[in-house]
Amino acid sequence: MTEDACRIDVWLWRARFFKTRSLAARVVEEGGVRLVRGQSRGPVDKPSRAVRCGDVLTFAQGPKWVVVRVEAFGERRGPATEARALYNVLNEAGATQRTQTPGA
């Protein structure tokens, strides 16, 4: 990948949303992650899909939906404080209950 993009499974793992990269890849393959980039939006089904700064991702974390904007890529899976700099949370601390698929 180029410096202005990162694989979605790698980014989700580096941002510490998933414990392993393979778990992040599985969730992506199962259609559990939605991507919004400009006017383009929809589910992501390939872990190799590139994310760019400014992209908005929606995915489930336990019983709640998480909506984040990608701010940076990072170079490693660092501590939580380092990972937190990779994104901005757009919903209020996961306040959206997971009762239905967002956008459905």
Where do the model's predicted regions map?
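Strongly charged
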Residues: 2-10, 14, 26, 34-104
